Every structure is written in C-alpha cells, then in structure tokens.
UniProtKB/Swiss-Prot annotation:
Residues the record lists as binding Zn(2+): C73, C76, C89, C92
Residues spanning the membrane: none
Protein name: Hydrogenase maturation factor HypA
Coiled coil start-end: none
C-alpha cells in the first residue's frame, strides 16, 4: 500500500512547512492526484488518518482533487481528453500522443494557524 508511504512523506513535508511558519496547527491540506497516478484516493484518505495522529496535521481536513488525463496528439498538434484508457486521438485516430496530465501526486496547498 504505497499510499501510506506517500502520505507519511506528505505529512512530514506539511509539518516542516508549518514549523517554518511558526504555526501551531495544520487546518487543511489539498492534494492533486492524477487519474492514472496509481494512487487510490480512498486509500490515501485512510492513510492520512493513520499517519497524521500526533502531528500538527492531526485534526486537519484533507482535500483530494482528481486531475483528469489530458493527452497531446503529435499528429494533430492538439490536446485532448481521452474518454477511456485507450488513448486514441478523437480527431485523427492516431496513437502518437504524449500524456500532459493525469500522473500528478502533489501537495497543492497547506492551511495553517
């Protein structure tokens, strides 16, 4: 369950940032998780509850934003959002594309007091 490792590191980063600001409490964390990152949002929330105890984030609210998959078609020179996991360009049917978004695992923001 790599969500525990991800959240352990995220809480450590959040705590260090809060301490640098002389904060006494982390009120909220917002994370961006890509749809094809391999991270399960529900498991990440569960991991947060497990690892935040005893830290400045103990009572914080975790908000998870899902980032959809966006591709760029090298043939059409256009971005597109694939309707499923078969990343065929809807305009030209090309399979020559690059993934622009959807793999993110990021701590977007931190709210402290």
């Amino acid at each position: 369950m790599h969500e525990v490792a991800i959240m352990t590191e995220t809480v450590a980063i959040a705590n260090a940032a809060a301490e640098r600001q002389n904060a006494t409490k982390i009120v909220g964390l917002t994370m961006r998780i890509g749809a094809i990152s391999g991270v399960v949002p529900e498991a990440l929330s569960f991991a947060f509850e497990a690892v935040a105890g005893g830290t400045l984030a103990e009572q914080a609210q975790l908000i998870i934003e899902t980032v959809p998959v966006t591709c760029y078609c090298a043939q059409c020179d256009r971005p597109f959002t694939p309707p499923d996991l078969f990343y065929e360009c809807p305009l030209c049917s090309s399979l020559s594309q690059h993934i622009l978004s959807g793999k993110e695992v990021e701590l977007k923001s931190l709210e402290v007091i």
